[in-house]
Amino acid sequence: MKLVNSLAEVTSAVKQCITNEMVENGLLNDVETFIPSYRLDEPMELPGIWLFEHPTIESDKKGSLSNLIYLKTPFEFVCIVYDEDLEQSEILGKNLAARVGHTILKNKNLITDDGRRIFNNVKFRTLYPAGEVQIDGKTNKTPATSIVLEIEYFVDWLKCNKI
């Protein structure tokens, strides 16, 4: 995979995994909003998922040739589900986060046009309460739950061309 294309390709594939399941009978068919970036001004209908991409670093794996490098990028999915009962809202948020994890694993074998898998590996990193979100028109804040998944992939430095 070319370096200049790989970072965008991996991010695009992660987004595609989510949107593939936001259909009737999909794992995320109840999700109203998917925000695939750091946009803070985006209106959100709930249930919702907000994607944050963390810094990409070198993976622990080593390439078999000097021009191959394995990278890993953590992706954080903040999941928010509103319920009048805050405890129920937290439970539903954890359920949505678990379904996001299932979605990425279910769709991780996405194939590129040239027949390669985009993800070499997907690792669970953490599931945690991510604070609270104020929802317009609601008096109570809603709990948010984050799941962090780490995507591993390789790039070939010799194929680093201008896009």
Q: Language-model segments: which ranges?
A:
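Acidic-leaning, charged glycine-interspersed low-complexity segments
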Residues: 20-26, 45-50, 94-154
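Intrinsically disordered, low-complexity regions of eukaryotic proteins
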Residues: 32-34, 55, 78, 85, ...
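Extracellular/virion structural assembly segments
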Residues: 66-70, 80-108
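Oligomerization/assembly interface segments of phage tail-like spikes and tubes
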Residues: 67-84, 141-155
